[in-house]
Amino acid sequence: VHETEPGEFSFEDEADLRHFVQLIGAEGMYCILRPGPYVGASWDLGGLPPWLTTIPGVTLRQSNPAAQGFLEASARFLGAVMEQVKDLQLTAPAPPDTESTLPGGGPIVMMQAEHAWFCHHPAQAQTYLGEIVRYLRENGCEVPIIVGNNFWQRVDGAFDTWSADEHLATDLRQMRLVQPEAPRFVSEVQCGQPDHWGEPHEHRSAAWCLNRLGQILSAGAQYNVHMFHGGTNFGFNGGCSDRSRDALITTSHDCGAPLSEAGDTTPMYWAVKRISMFASQFGQVLA
């Protein structure tokens, strides 16, 4: 979307990231920015531009001699992204003409480097994920950086988050021992899963979601509901799950979200709102 040709960036129209983040602030919401370079299987090639695969012998999402072209492209892309949003971080000075109702320069309170890098390779974790963290910092990221990797690997300069559906209360209590210096944070509480062509829609009830959110709060942790509004994968932007080559994700990315694909409230919305209001009032007690 942002770099359809090498080195040619677009941040206009539907790719206007800066305006989107400003709208978040104008509505009084905070933003966890996930610039990638890989952003998840729901996007075609995880959001990576297809031209990366034309680099001779290239390897993606790694740090080795064959991945040099990928790393150079990642550094260039993250630099362009940070140029758009670095003054929209909560740590930046507030401009006099801001529409944001929040303190600071903007709503960005956290950034995520990469996504779901489930790889048992400590050296790669430091040389690849560590490089992504470095690119963000050197280009002006001042807010905390997370890596949503479920503790497969620790990365200097970032703290890890959790993403799972089961055993949340016990797992999050163990996080206190594994990462005592950082908050316990579930970066993806999935109220539903993406639909795949040729398969029935997976439905998760509001009670199911409430149970998971309750477990998280009981462990003194925080959560981010993903997706809160699923939207639509227009054109050929839908991705593919890793379980098979033909597990293609539909154009609908509703994912059972509290706000439907059309923007309507659902029973899930009212359930999530109720427990979130409770958490906001009793957060100090729960922590």
Question: What spans do the regions from the language model cover?
Answer:
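Carbohydrate-binding surfaces of carbohydrate-active enzymes
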Residues: 71-85, 89, 97-113, 118-129, ...
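A cross-domain feature marking catalytic cores of carbohydrate-active enzymes
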Residues: 1, 33-37, 113-115, 147-149, ...
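The substrate-binding groove and active-site-proximal loops of carbohydrate-active enzymes
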Residues: 1-15, 53-76, 112-126, 159-166, ...
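Noncatalytic carbohydrate-binding groove/subsite architecture in carbohydrate-active enzymes
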Residues: 122-216
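Aromatic-lined substrate-binding rim segments of carbohydrate-active enzymes
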Residues: 1-46, 50-51, 133-138
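Short, solvent-exposed loop/turn and secondary-structure capping segments
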Residues: 5-6, 34-36, 42-47, 123-124, ...
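An active-site-proximal structural segment forming one wall of the substrate-binding cleft
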Residues: 13-35, 54-108
